[in-house]
C-alpha cells in the first residue's frame, strides 16, 4: 500500500506541492504559479500524487481544488516510526515489515 506514496514523495516538485497544500487547498493554476514548469507538468505531478492517494481533488464551481489526504500521510508517518524504533521482536519485525 505504501509503495506509491513513497515513490510519489521521491520527486522534489511533488514534495513542494505537498508543502503548498499543507497551508491550504489550491487549484492547479495556483500551484503552477509557484513553479517555473509547464501546466501540463504540474498536472502530471498532481495525477501522480492523486494515484498515490496523497492528494484529493474536489470541483467547486468551475475550479478543481486540490487538498492533502491526511489519512495516507498518517500511514506513512506510522511506517517511519515503526521502521526507526527497535522492537523486542528483533529481526522478525523486518520480515513482517517488508510484506506491508
Regions found by a protein language model. Give the residues of each.
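Short capping segments at the starts of secondary-structure elements
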Residues: 23-29
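Helix-turn-helix DNA-binding motif, specifically the short coil turn and the N-cap/start of the second
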Residues: 27, 38-41
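Amphipathic alpha-helical dimerization/coiled-coil segments
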Residues: 1, 74-100
Amino acid at each position: 500500500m505504501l509503495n506509491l506514496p513513497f515513490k510519489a514523495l521521491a520527486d522534489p516538485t511533488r514534495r513542494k506541492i505537498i508543502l503548498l497544500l499543507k497551508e491550504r487547498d489550491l487549484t492547479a493554476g495556483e500551484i503552477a504559479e509557484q513553479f517555473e514548469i509547464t501546466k501540463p507538468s504540474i498536472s502530471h505531478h498532481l495525477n501522480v500524487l492523486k494515484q498515490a492517494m496523497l492528494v484529493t481533488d474536489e470541483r467547486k464551481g468551475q475550479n478543481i481544488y486540490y487538498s492533502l489526504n491526511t489519512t495516507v500521510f498518517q500511514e506513512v508517518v506510522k511506517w517511519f516510526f515503526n521502521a526507526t524504533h527497535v522492537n523486542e521482536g528483533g529481526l522478525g519485525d523486518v520480515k513482517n515489515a517488508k510484506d506491508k
